[in-house]
Amino acid sequence: VTGSPMAEVLHQNLAEIEASDVHNRLGLEKGKYILLSAHREENIDTEKNFLSLFSAINAMAEKYDMPILYSCHPRSRNRLASSSFQLDSRVQVQQPLGFHDYNCLQMNAFAVVSDSGTLPEESSFFTSVGHPFPAVCIRTSPERPESLDKAGFILSGIDEKGLLQSVDTAVELVKSGDYGTPVPNYIDENVSTKVVKIIQSYVGVVNKMVWRKEI
């Protein structure tokens, strides 16, 4: 009914996102790092999936030979600490990054590799404001197929072959100027206004017809 509030939130914070000094603080060069977020229960807590995904991440580090900045959630950090799995030295494990810093890193990354549910929305928004980035979703099924249908991101799966092919494809498409098409509801910036007007418009009707209240 209302669309996603993500674009409105990002738009309201865009100046702060663009002004972030996170690259200087972390010693990163724009366009020469991969931003990673991997925290989904199915990717972290299931042994087979965990080993498949993180082996693929190590292969990605070896292939591209650039820093992989891992914004690491507590679930993932604890899983890595309890495992004997060794991450490639190019994977830099960081505490979870703040909103402004993370989004600044997204829009300046060589590629964003993430299992976050908001990746399709962020990709659509940043494309719409002139900051497209190669977006790769490390999951086996999408939560937001409407963005996949608009070529807003690539669903890679969690195996090495799928991940490497997907990063290659996403990067080359963005380089060629083919960014996909933003999903209209993902770039709608008046969601809060719609919510207020819908509530004000329908509260009387709902109270009368659903809850049988006398107004």
What are these regions (language model features)?
Residues V1-I215:
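Nucleotide-activated sugar donor-binding and catalytic core shared by glycosyltransferases
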